[in-house]
């Protein structure tokens, strides 16, 4: 392999022919590979099968978990999530299996009713806006798009969103009602917000009195190294500045136990807790407390969660390493055609290919039997201005499948880049 940017047109043409020949070999294999979504693989979910042996239905206080009641969640479950999230049990609301559903419910709540500090429901705010760090989580963006918010992109950095941009925007525009954040091992870059970034979120001035930070701790215990990274707890930091009502923290066991049968939680201020309980009480009497109790009995406490996640780590690290090894071996020798993140946790690797090539790479992969998240999906309205970013999710396939998929992906990246370089020389 040689640097593509130093090749003559004849050399690039020969390289294209060789890559096309290799690509056809992958097509002939009849592959059905998927690295599109951040799903746990069967080997991870198998680790939690002990949950199904938890048949106890009586809480430590003698409550029958089979019955109605305890809208905020079982006390034991609130203690468990408070331990994991670093907050008090009374600041935790434990819900059903989907934290995304609770996020949707809270956006809907703001839209229909507003929050206690809102001058009016968000639905009555013309040209309402929401900040979206990019690249970010497509399902977050879809919720606020569904409710008619204009989505404003904010650049991500290795220490979190560009806070100079965030602070300027929220200080000047009272129609900006919130921001989406994945503060630990962000989706998709795998970045963790710095202490300074978290402090700035807590103390920043906002023109909107009802500005909300949707703080999604989806990967709070999803470490890929022996280093257990812990960051300041935003809710606790906000208390120092009297801004605790601006934050909703979320987490769930979706990528700890069973994605379709886990438990989710919100952490928020006392005032916010009273308000959301009032609104939720009209919608539901209680969530699945039997499942909450099963999770408490199985995971026990934060130490139990971390011990369980260490088993996940041992199974996931080889898959992440396989992707990065393929990138190093197959892309670096070709020159500056791509770069990628090296996350210490989470579920994704961000691959940035030469601008103008991401859609072509994704299409080439699809035609050879490898499904990736659509190019541009990590940006509002699925529009990546550079057409450069691809989110790689190596968690669900087997290690052999990840290795094959990574080799195919590299062929597709190189082929797309060579095609573009030849087109530019035409």
What are these regions (language model features)?
Residues 63-209, 220-242, 410, 414-425:
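Conserved core of the PLP fold type I
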Residues 38-42, 99-100, 136-138, 159, ...:
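Short, solvent-exposed loop/turn segments at secondary-structure junctions
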Residues 361-367, 405-410:
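Short amphipathic alpha-helices in soluble, non-transmembrane regions
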